[in-house]
Amino acid sequence: MKADKLRQEFLEYFKKNKHEVIASASLIPDNDPTVLFTTAGMHPLVPFLMGEKHPCGTRLVNVQKCIRTGDIEEVGDTTHHTFFEMLGNWSLGDYDEEQAVKYSWEFIIKELKLDKNKIAISIFGGNDDVPKDTEAEKYWLEAGVAQDRITAVLDNFWGPAGQTGPCGPDTEIFYW
């Protein structure tokens, strides 16, 4: 599948599930001195994740252009790039992590028709301040991911970009 087709199918799937498509924000963030570039899909949405009302509603979907330089030494291996597009579906207080996992699973298994036995998941493994994300692990197991295909890692934690701000554990999907 080519990238254009994947983008289109992702946006269409979430539109079908009552999400509004929003445009990719600028690669140079407005009014944010903490970063040089937009580094993640959620970066332009931080004010809305903090409670500000988004003009398009509480369910959003986008394909955000991103540039990262923090791990520039690793660019060129099999997993790191400087520029990439991040597919994102966003619930601004509309649905919970369990529903987000269900949407992700349905998209990759039913829409993309990926082999579920080749899906691997990473979850936040916990640290001294925040415990392991057992909730995400539970939802992935309920969706049908085998226990031995779920890995807890320490760096599955987003933000904050500065001293404070939205942050928390994340989960990622891999295919091999």
Ranges and model annotations:
Residues 1-176:
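Structured aminoacyl-transfer and RNA-binding surfaces used for tRNA recognition/handling
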